[in-house]
Structure formats: C-alpha cells, structure tokens
Amino acid sequence: MIVLGALLVLGVLQGLVWAAVAPGVPYKVLADGRFGALPTTSTYHFVAAAIFALSGMVIGVVVAAAAWQIRSARGWQMLVTVVGGSLVGATVGWLLGEVLAGGVDPASVGVTAADSIVTAPATTGTWLVVLAQPALAAAVYTFLAAWNGHPTLDRPDLYEVS
C-alpha cells in the first residue's frame, strides 16, 4: 500500500510539474475568427510529450529500485504492484496535467479587430506517453530480479533453516 500511495502522490506531482513546464501550442487567430496552427506546432507537441514521458521514466526507475530494496516483499507481487501503480500514477498525472495546463483555446477568441497569436494549453497529443513509466519500471525491476542470482531473491522469510 505504501508503494501504491507513493506512486499516486508522484503521479499528482508529475502532473503539476508537467502542467507548469510543458510548452503551450501557438496558433494564429485571424481577425474574422478563423485560426490555424503555426508551422512549428508539431515541435511543441513533441516537447510536451517528451517531458511527460521522460519524467515518468525517471519515476519508474526510482520507484522500481526503491521497491527492490524492500527485501521482504520481493517477487512477482511487488512487480505487479510497481507496474500497476505506475500505470495508475502516470494516468492520474497525465489527466491532471492536461486539465491544469494553462492557455487559451483558439476557437474561443472569436472575431477581433486584428490578427493575433494565442497559446493553447499544452497537450501530449496521445495517451501512449502514460505507458513509458510502467514499462521502464517493469524492465528495471525484472533486471534487478534477474541480476540477483538467489533462488529466493534474497528474501529473509524464504531462507531454509537447516
């Protein structure tokens, strides 16, 4: 439960940080209310997605390594907890970040006296960025288990008493 709670808190923090640092998308709004994306719009989507995915990957590595340090809970149950919690935490962060990202919807500007440039809220463009965190968490935890070399994963409760 501690691991799940930590992953939820980290997901909320990830969403807050992402909403603050991810770049919004610039649009040109014409005086008659029509709008269009600027030529560099795809770059902004890529940067926003990369920031979210990389922050999730860092969280995934740190949480997997920290969970491995809990010797009494090593095993497939902790792997499922870390991966499932990472998926839930990343989803919470993604949804929260998308809601909190500041900006102006270009469709809401309407008719104005002159053309203008507005910045729409940041968006990752896809929900697939959520998968980076649990995927790397699973890879790191599995690597640590494979590298361990002990049949009992060095769990103190599984040592045989002779």
List each model region and its residues:
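Interfacial non-cytosolic loop connecting adjacent transmembrane helices
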Residues: 98-118
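Cytoplasmic membrane-interface segments at the C-terminal ends of transmembrane helices
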Residues: 1, 23, 61-82, 98-105, ...
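N-terminal export and membrane-targeting signals
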Residues: 1-8, 50, 73-86, 125-132
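Membrane-helix exit/juxtamembrane interface segments
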Residues: 15-31, 99-103
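Perimembrane loop-to-helix junctions flanking transmembrane segments
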Residues: 26-45, 111-114
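Hydrophobic alpha-helical membrane-insertion segments
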Residues: 3-19, 80-98
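Alpha-helical transmembrane segments within multi-pass membrane transporters and channels
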Residues: 57-67, 85-88, 92
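Hydrophobic alpha-helical transmembrane segments
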Residues: 44-58, 116-139
